Amino acid sequence: MHSSLIKLGFLLLLLQVSLSHAQLSPSFYDKTCPQVFDIVTNTIVNALRSDPRIAASILRLHFHDCFVNGCDASILLDNTTSFRTEKDAFGNANSARGFDVIDKMKAAIEKACPRTVSCADMLAIAAKESIVLAGGPSWMVPNGRRDSLRGFMDLANDNLPGPSSTLKQLKDRFKNVGLDRSSDLVALSGGHTFGKSQCQFIMDRLYNFGETGLPDPTLDKSYLATLRKQCPRNGNQSVLVDFDLRTPTLFDNKYYVNLKENKGLIQSDQELFSSPDAADTLPLVRAYADGQGTFFDAFVKAIIRMSSLSPLTGKQGEIRLNCRVVNSKSKIMDVVDDALEFASFM
């Protein structure tokens, strides 16, 4: 009975998404590129062999893409003379990663289905497959997005939640992009159930919280001692620390168990449980900690909503041939490559 209700709820959610964004559909590539899902999965599986972090990194790319002008693959663009890349924004600089895997994925898709699958759709599919490979839930990704023609670094600086954000700031950032439900914020924050963060993002919590010269009082004392060993006061701040001390490579509900024990890694995570303003988020943390299925159901609903934010569809934008550059640049680079190849035979 419970399973049937979940399926019914999922179908109703897809109907809601399709009514809001009629051009997005889980069957969008059924006839034009049905192999896209296998290509994406195989690329991630191969990458995981040498990089256990890559699944979490790809999910983060999708999150940070959708929070800036909708899910349009703008985060994948490199710098040009006309705009600064989102890769240079505070929330991405020296931390966003996985672009080489995205390049391999796109090259394989272009070989199989030329000029068919957008980078934005590919990234949304890759985020889902990354979660599934890490033990998380599966869902049908609504597709049909197209790619932006530019990046938005300033908007990324304004929209992306930061590691030291208060609960009020988090709610404001989510509301600004169209995610105004507490369940969206708490469920999507569960993406931190795997992956790593750098010491630089928690140093204030460990040593000088709120300019007090003291650690964050919400931090569990034993966890504080552990983190201080990993991130000494004058140590290398690029050292990586697991978000989830229990199951760092699995997509599960242990993130919320950690929050209940005051063992959230970054301030913005612990705020969901420990903030004085957490009257609406604290019960959700408890519910997700007590039931992994409850968390999975909420996460799927929230990520479908997020991935359907303000998509470019129809003839808007383009389908990039190379996710790093808009197509006019891709064509120029192809001409240059062809010329260099020709010259090598002269």
From Swiss-Prot:
Documented EC number(s): 1.11.1.7
Binding of substrate, residues: P161
Keyword Disulfide bond annotated? yes
The protein's required cofactors:
heme b; Ca(2+)
Q: Reaction(s) catalyzed by this protein?
A: 2 a phenolic donor + H2O2 = 2 a phenolic radical donor + 2 H2O
Q: Name one GO cellular component term.
A: plant-type vacuole
Provide the disulphide bond pattern. C33-C113, C66-C71, C119-C323, C199-C231
Query: Quick one: which residues bind Ca(2+) 1?
Result: D65, V68, G70, D72, S74
Instruction: Write one Gene Ontology MF term.
Output: lactoperoxidase activity
Superkingdom of the source? Eukaryota
> What does the UniProt entry say about where the protein is found?
Secreted; Vacuole
State which residues carry a glycan (glycosylated).
N79, N236
* Role: Removal of H(2)O(2), oxidation of toxic reductants, biosynthesis and degradation of lignin, suberization, auxin catabolism, response to environmental stresses such as wounding, pathogen attack and oxidative stress. These functions might be dependent on each isozyme/isoform in each plant tissue.
What does the record's miscellaneous section state? There are 73 peroxidase genes in A.thaliana.
Q: What is this protein called?
A: Peroxidase 38
The species is Arabidopsis thaliana
User: What does the organism's lineage look like at the top?
Assistant: Eukaryota, Viridiplantae, Streptophyta, Embryophyta, Tracheophyta
